[in-house]
From Swiss-Prot:
Keyword Lyase included in the entry's annotation: yes
Co-factor binding comment: Binds 1 pyruvoyl group covalently per subunit.
Example GO BP: arginine catabolic process
Enzyme class name: lyase
Keyword terms, alphabetized: Decarboxylase, Lyase, Pyruvate
Catalyses which reaction(s): L-arginine + H(+) = agmatine + CO2
Official protein name in the record: Pyruvoyl-dependent arginine decarboxylase
NCBIfam families: pyruvoyl-dependent arginine decarboxylase
Gene3D superfamilies: 3.30.60.30, Pyruvoyl-Dependent Histidine Decarboxylase, subunit B
Residues found modified as Pyruvic acid (Ser): 44
InterPro entries, alphabetized: Pyr-dep_his/arg-deCO2ase, Pyr-dep_his/arg-deCO2ase_sand, Pyruvoyl-dep_arg_deCO2ase
Molecular functions per Gene Ontology: arginine decarboxylase activity
Protein family according to the UniProt entry: Belongs to the PdaD family.
Lineage of the organism: Archaea, Methanobacteriati, Methanobacteriota, Thermococci, Thermococcales
Length: 158
């Protein structure tokens, strides 16, 4: 198997309920449009000159391996609010960037603030110039079924 550096990426987030916590996670992936692929978990570096998409490419093959940075949380505790957030920091000149993720028992605004701080610190410790921060998040309050919140950056080789 050979890997190539991704050329395109998209930020996604969703929350969903399900019959089990795993089904809730799967349902959130389906809501995002990535429930029928295999997510290959990555760490946090964005390749230089990546193109950011506004919508998923059409006809992604079932079972395709897609490099992905993601965070998720599931709960079956009625009344609890859970959130997942993912933030990207883009450098001057699109020479690369960083992705940070957070999920927890909190409102999405708290999760968003956490990833914003992480992006800023990641750039600071590297001595990189931060041009822009983008954040996606999802929040759900558990009712009578298990729930999940998921946030992801999915990368594509084409």
């Amino acid at each position: 198997m050979s890997w190539i550096t991704p050329k395109k990426a998209i930020m996604l987030a969703a929350a969903a309920e399900g019959g089990t916590k795993l089904n809730a996670f799967d349902n959130a992936l389906l809501k995002m449009g990535i429930g029928n692929v295999n997510l290959v978990k990555l760490s946090s570096v964005i390749p230089a000159h990546i193109e950011w998409l506004d919508e998923l490419p059409k006809n992604i093959p079932i079972g395709m391996l897609l490099p992905t940075v993601y965070t998720h949380i599931e709960s079956d505790e009625p009344g609890s609010t859970i959130s997942a957030a993912l933030g990207i920091g883009l450098s001057e000149g699109n020479e690369g960037g960083l992705i940070y993720e957070y999920s927890g028992y909190c409102k999405k605004e708290e999760a968003e603030e956490m990833v914003k701080k992480m992006v800023e610190e990641g750039f600071r410790v590297r001595g990189w110039k931060l041009k822009e921060i983008k954040i996606v998040s999802a929040e759900i309050t558990v009712k009578d079924k298990p729930a999940a919140a998921v946030a992801a950056v999915v990368m594509f080789p084409y």
